[in-house]
């Protein structure tokens, strides 16, 4: 009685419940894809997964079961009464009737497992079906690169699938034969019946063909090898190993047939000899002889013999990371830079980023978080036209942090607190007298101090929006707090899925594991449920075959709406001769810009690199998913920028693969590296500047290089971001016969400056935390300017204030309260007052003597007051300013 009840319970527990959960997840995913307008993407993937899964599982089942049933029909009159296996002893007559049902059940289980594996290969199958020709062939075997990107992965999967199918069939049939008595271990040895031998012979002959196919495919794998000095197939691979594998691909089926013939006839010598020959040939041709050839011929003449293969590695790595488009131009540094030239590059100076991301995030959090349940997760860098000026800005969205809600309950977390509110935006270089950032946009509701307006400040979809919410309910949503009380709002967007039936309520309740969705009286037929709100997970759900940047950035479009832009990358592990990254990727393109509306969650994927061969195939598979870049609204195009992450990858490769001469490459004569400050590599940084030979400033991404194991500069790499110039990259190389200071050398000079080191020591002794910001190398005309901000905080949790700016040029290193004053000390002259700060500036070089005398007296009096107060750092500062004024008077 108990067993009869237990069976349906176990069936429900292990079969029905998981199946329903699986179907429920598919249903909610389907509604999500319909909501975002990409239902065809969902169905394409679903049909592919289903079809491939059924095909893989069905073929295995159709092959395994007939073999099993054939083996089960065999009769062996001399079989013993018992089946013995170690301590197990079963009566044969009672066991034989169970073979068929249990065997079929086992076959079904294996087929189900293989079907699930097959369903996971949907992407490789669709890439193969929609493959395109790249137009470039590999230099060794002569296959089009498209074969490696789109065909080879599937062929290797099929090889593994056939191997598994034949081995599983062989093991299952041998087990059946053993149970039926066709295989027996006796005192005379192992006895195998004739039918068993012949059946096994056929399976092994088929298996040898699959092994031969494996040898054939292994030949293509040689093109991914690591030779130490370079990547790809080398001299020994091409002249020995490739020939060996080709030979093995032909002789293995012959060996398999001989083995099968020997097994069929019961000639054991013929059974053992063929596999021994194949293994011996493999060991000699793939291990022994290549090692000897490498040691005695190649190693002594490596450069001469490996030069063509090194050249292949250079060419294909440059293709794999799109390095071929990088234009290398000489940059002849001039250490003479006048005040007039500084003035001519006023826009560059105004846009030097003084505010570092980490201190600014901390400052924004303390000044603009407004309430504890709001959070600034990240600070983004972008450019806008601000009051008619092309300006670089720092921007951070004010998101809702559910972890910091004062009262955590389902109504608060799901119905009332549904979204973040607005952004904080400010210039990259301007500071108040207190050392704090200035703002273009601040507060809740948003107060705009520039001509940038935010008309839709609500953030329902963001980096911190990890859970579902339900909007348009009877409960008003919290919008923002005021001095007189909270302001409420009601969602008015098209995002989310309508919860307009009891069935949908029940399904969502089951999916999110809460009965409150069904029981809540606040949810109406007009209510909508917003889920998959985390923007990174949202786009990954829609396009799982793309890799997405870990740092989405928010923009304000020309209509005042908040949009997220996320860089997306196509990638492959299969480009021959290309050096791989740590994770194995050896082909990468930033081909897609994903845009997510922060209010309604609408997603668009724009093609930023139409020449990417991988994206061409994905666009064939999912034609409704991608839009051309021309379709992007102009209000968003002006905020598209070259990917920070992709330039990092390109720079890491270009540091070696800018050397296109195989001899120079082999000897590493001109190897570069990304400069290291402290224990951290410098990262690319955005800035606005006028590139050499250009007439106006533009938004660029910049990164310097140093020669390997040296601290001076070798080059600087820049990627352009604006308009038609988007994606153009240049490497400006410095003369190799001259010393150009690198960031680490400038850092050492800063530390050796007695005045600066004294000031830093004084601040640290007073308990303040000194935070040294990022050092920026800013090219101006034909010169280089080095800028590093200094932040002071009362303690580790204190408010960081930008208190000093260090500027280095040539042999001079100065530290002043503002960038303006530092530049005046080095170059003299008077720059526009609004350049970097709202603080007082140094006297004009052309001021009247009477004005300078009054300024000198004022500085002297302030210095005396500082001395009386014991403020020695302030005293030193005033004396330095007095010295500056006296020098002006002397002129």
UniProtKB/Swiss-Prot annotation:
Report how it sits in the membrane: Multi-pass membrane protein
- Which stretches are transmembrane? 6-26, 51-71, 102-122, 164-184, 202-222, 244-264, 266-286
* Keyword entries, A-Z: Cell membrane, Membrane, Transmembrane, Transmembrane helix
Q: Give the subcellular location.
A: Cell membrane
Superkingdom of source: Bacteria
Main localization category: membrane
Cellular component GO terms, alphabetical: extracellular region; plasma membrane
Q: Which residues form a coiled coil?
A: none
Family note: Belongs to the UPF0182 family.
- The entry's protein name is UPF0182 protein Glov_0814
Q: Which organism is it from?
A: Trichlorobacter lovleyi (strain ATCC BAA-1151 / DSM 17278 / SZ) (Geobacter lovleyi)
């Amino acid at each position: 009685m108990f067993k009869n009840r237990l069976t349906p319970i176990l069936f429900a527990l292990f079969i029905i419940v998981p199946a329903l959960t699986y179907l429920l997840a598919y249903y909610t995913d389907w509604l999500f894809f319909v909501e975002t307008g990409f239902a065809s993407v969902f169905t394409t993937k679903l049909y592919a997964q289903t079809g491939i899964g059924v095909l893989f599982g069905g073929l295995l089942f159709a092959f395994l079961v007939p073999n099993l049933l054939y083996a089960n029909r065999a009769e062996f009159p001399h079989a013993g009464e018992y089946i013995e296996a170690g301590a197990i002893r079963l009566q044969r007559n009672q066991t034989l009737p169970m073979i068929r049902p249990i065997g079929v059940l086992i076959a079904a289980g294996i087929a189900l497992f293989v079907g699930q594996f097959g369903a996971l290969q949907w992407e490789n199958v669709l890439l193969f079906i929609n493959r395109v020709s790249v137009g470039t062939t590999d230099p060794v075997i002569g296959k089009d690169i498209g074969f490696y990107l789109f065909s080879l992965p599937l062929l290797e999967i099929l090889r593994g699938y056939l191997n598994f199918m034949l081995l599983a069939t062989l093991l299952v049939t041998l087990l059946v034969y053993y149970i039926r008595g066709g295989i027996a271990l006796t005192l005379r040895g192992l006895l195998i019946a004739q039918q068993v031998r012949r059946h096994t012979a056929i399976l092994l002959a088929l298996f040898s063909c699959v092994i031969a196919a494996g040898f054939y495919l292994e030949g293509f794998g040689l093109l991914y090898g690591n030779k130490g000095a370079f990547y790809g197939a080398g001299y020994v691979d091409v002249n020995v190993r490739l020939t060996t594998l080709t030979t093995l691909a032909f002789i293995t089926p012959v060996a398999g047939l001989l083995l099968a013939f020997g097994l069929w006839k019961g000639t054991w010598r013929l059974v053992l000899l063929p596999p021994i020959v194949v293994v011996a040939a493999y060991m000699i041709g793939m291990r022994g002889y290549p090692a000897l050839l490498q040691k005695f011929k190649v190693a002594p003449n490596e450069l001469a013999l490996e030069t063509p293969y090194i050249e292949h590695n250079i060419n294909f790595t440059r293709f794999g990371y799109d390095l071929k488009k990088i234009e290398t131009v000489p940059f002849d540094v001039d250490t003479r830079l006048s005040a007039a030239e500084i003035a001519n590059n006023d826009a560059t100076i105004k846009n030097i980023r003084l505010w570092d991301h980490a201190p600014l995030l901390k400052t924004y959090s303390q000044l603009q978080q407004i309430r504890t349940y709001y959070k600034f997760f990240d600070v983004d860098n972008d450019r806008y036209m601000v009051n008619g000026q092309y300006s670089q800005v720092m921007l951070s969205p004010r998101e809702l942090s559910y972890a910091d809600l004062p009262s955590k309950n389902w109504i608060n977390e799901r119905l009332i607190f549904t979204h973040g509110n607005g952004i904080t935006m400010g210039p990259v270089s301007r500071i108040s007298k207190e050392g704090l950032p200035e703002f273009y946009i601040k507060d809740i509701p948003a107060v705009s101090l520039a001509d940038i307006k935010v008309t839709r400040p609500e953030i329902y979809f963001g980096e911190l929006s990890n859970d579902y919410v339900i909007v348009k309910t009877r409960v008003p949503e919290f919008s923002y707090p005021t001095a007189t009380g909270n302001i409420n709002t009601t969602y008015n967007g098209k995002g989310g899925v309508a919860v307009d039936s009891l069935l949908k309520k029940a399904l969502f309740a089951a999916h999110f594991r809460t009965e409150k969705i069904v029981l809540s009286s606040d949810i109406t037929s007009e209510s909508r449920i917003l889920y998959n709100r985390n923007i990174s997970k949202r786009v990954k759900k829609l396009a799982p075959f793309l890799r997405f940047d870990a740092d989405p950035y928010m923009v304000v479009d020309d209509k005042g709406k908040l949009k997220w832009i996320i860089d997306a990358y196509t990638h492959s592990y299969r480009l021959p001769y290309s050096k791989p990254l740590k994770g194995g990727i050896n082909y990468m393109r930033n081909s897609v810009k994903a845009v997510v509306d922060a209010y309604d969650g609408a997603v668009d994927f724009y093609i930023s690199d139409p020449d990417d061969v991988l994206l061409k195939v994905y666009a064939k598979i999912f034609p409704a998913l991608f839009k051309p870049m021309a379709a992007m609204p102009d209000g968003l195009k002006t905020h598209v920028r070259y990917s920070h992450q992709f330039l990092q990858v390109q720079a890491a490769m270009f540091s070696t693969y800018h050397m296109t001469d195989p001899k120079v490459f082999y000897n590493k004569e001109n190897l570069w590296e990304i400069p290291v400050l402290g224990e951290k590599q410098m990262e690319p940084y955005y800035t606005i500047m006028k590139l050499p030979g250009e007439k106006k400033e533009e938004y660029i991404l910049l990164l310097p290089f140093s020669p390997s194991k040296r601290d001076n500069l070798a080059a600087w790499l820049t990627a352009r971001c604006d308009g038609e110039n988007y994606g153009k990259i240049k490497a400006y190389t410095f003369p190799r016969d001259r010393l150009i200071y690198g960031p680490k050398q400038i850092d050492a000079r800063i530390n050796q400056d007695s005045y600066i080191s004294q000031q830093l020591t004084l601040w640290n002794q007073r308990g303040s935390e000194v935070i040294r910001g990022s050092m920026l190398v800013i090219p101006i005309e034909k010169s280089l300017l080095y800028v590093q901000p200094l932040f002071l905080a009362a303690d580790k949790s204190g408010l960081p204030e930008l208190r000093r700016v260090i500027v280095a040029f040539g042999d001079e290193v100065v530290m002043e309260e503002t960038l303006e004053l530092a530049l005046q000390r080095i170059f003299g002259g008077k720059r526009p007052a609004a350049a970097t700060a709202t603080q007082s500036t140094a006297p004009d070089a052309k001021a009247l003597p009477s004005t300078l005398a009054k300024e000198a007296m004022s500085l002297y009096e302030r210095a005396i007051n500082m001395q009386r107060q014991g403020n020695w750092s302030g005293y030193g500062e005033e004396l330095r300013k007095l010295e500056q004024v006296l020098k002006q008077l002397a002129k």
